[in-house]
Amino acid sequence: MLKKQTAGLVLWGAIIFVGWNALLLLFFWTRPAPGRLPSDSALGDDPASLTREVIHLAEDAEAELERQRGLLQQIKEHYALWRQRWRVPTVAPPAWPRVPVTPSPVQIPILVIACDRSTVRRCLDKLLHYRPSAERFPIIVSQDCGHEETAQVIASYGTAVTHIRQPDLSNIAVQPDHRKFQGYYKIARHYRWALGQIFNKFKFPAAVVVEDDLEVAPDFFEYFQATYPLLRTDPSLWCVSAWNDNGKEQMVDSSKPELLYRTDFFPGLGWLLLADLWAELEPKWPKAFWDDWMRRPEQRKGRACIRPEISRTMTFGRKGVSHGQFFDQHLKFIKLNQQFVPFTQLDLSYLQQEAYDRDFLAQVYGAPQLQVEKVRTNDQKELGEVRVQYTSRDSFKAFAKALGVMDDLKSGVPRAGYRGIVTFQFRGRRVHLAPPQTWTGYDPSWN
């Protein structure tokens, strides 16, 4: 009898779904033809018209997918209600304790990666100016490239910093089509050697990695001192970063410098890691493009980083292997926090995975959904916090570009994203660019 009822319910669900799609197909066949798209020449004269058309098409696709999803969800809910009568009650697992974070006196070195920028002085001056303790935060400058002027600048700090030099300055044998990427190969070699010195030779339990073209915020050390215990105790975390990829002035809430997030995207640009992580990564360290390698699923393993609302580092180095394009287009606009936040006196337990997932997802999916064009034109300002939904790679990229956030993806993960959600400020209100609540994971083919 039970099998007959189950089969009947599934059959009726299938009939409803097929019938709905048949009606939908009939609707599309019989509705009046839409107006013609603008000609290529017209679009060329009016780029804004093309943007509106792309957004309109993406929103139409989103709306149709949402209707289909709603019908399937109704079928699932009715089936679940029926099955619930036959389900044996289960005991919920015990909740994790919410333990307030306390500051740790552990010694955390600042590893400065240097090469041929004599402007490393600007980086070191700020680090030394804001450093609360030379004993707790020793500064170790690892220099590659053999650039003598840079070496003299580092040496001028005497015992205030420790100067180590990467000994292998030879070119690296690469494939002919990768000769133009020689710089990226040398950077990966330098990182491997420098991190090996920190963890294998000096035996530090953790380190903050800083490039020589970064300027730090007044609470840079406070931030890492407070988040270190979280990183050490929460296995779902693998780094703490000082960087917000969408941290431009107009895209952050300047009134909340204390705000921190979890992110699935590895940000770099001033980041804390543990010795245990280096022991995991060192045997398979890549020959080049180490940061994108870190963002692959095989390395990330579902783990997250902590990142701030307002960046605690700012890059001033236009010169580099990327020839300045990314700096001119994006990096130079990132806001550096100037207000000291006493993070070690705050309860940061809300960043632990169980609490964060519960509260953050409730906040995002409790926010009213608004079409991207209405967000762009600042309609319904009274809503304050809103959600813009995407369901495909193309709709994410279209909506991200329309709202001014970074639209690139690494192994399916958006910059600053957590569970597919990118949170930012737009024209004074909080916006969450988010997938449906039924999101189950990243698609690595979204690149």
From Swiss-Prot:
Cytoplasmic topological domain ranges are 1-6
The active site consists of D291 (proton acceptor)
Q: From the UniProt record, which GO molecular function terms apply?
A: acetylglucosaminyltransferase activity; alpha-1,3-mannosylglycoprotein 2-beta-N-acetylglucosaminyltransferase activity; manganese ion binding
Q: Which cysteines are joined by disulfide bonds?
A: C115-C145, C239-C305
GO biological process, alphabetically ordered: in utero embryonic development; protein N-linked glycosylation via asparagine; UDP-N-acetylglucosamine catabolic process
Stated membrane topology is: Single-pass type II membrane protein
Residues reported to bind Mn(2+): D213
Instruction: Locate the residues binding substrate.
Output: R117, D144, H190, D212, S322
A Gene Ontology term for the protein's cellular component = Golgi membrane
Q: Give the superkingdom in one word.
A: Eukaryota
Query: Which intervals lie on the Lumenal side per UniProt?
Result: 30-447
Tell me where it mainly resides.
Golgi
| Protein localization | Golgi apparatus membrane; Cytoplasm, Perinuclear region
Task: Cite the SUPFAM superfamilies for this sequence.
Answer: Nucleotide-diphospho-sugar transferases (SSF53448)
Q: What does this protein do?
A: Initiates complex N-linked carbohydrate formation. Essential for the conversion of high-mannose to hybrid and complex N-glycans.
Which protein is depicted?
Alpha-1,3-mannosyl-glycoprotein 2-beta-N-acetylglucosaminyltransferase
The record lists the lineage as:
Eukaryota, Metazoa, Chordata, Craniata, Vertebrata
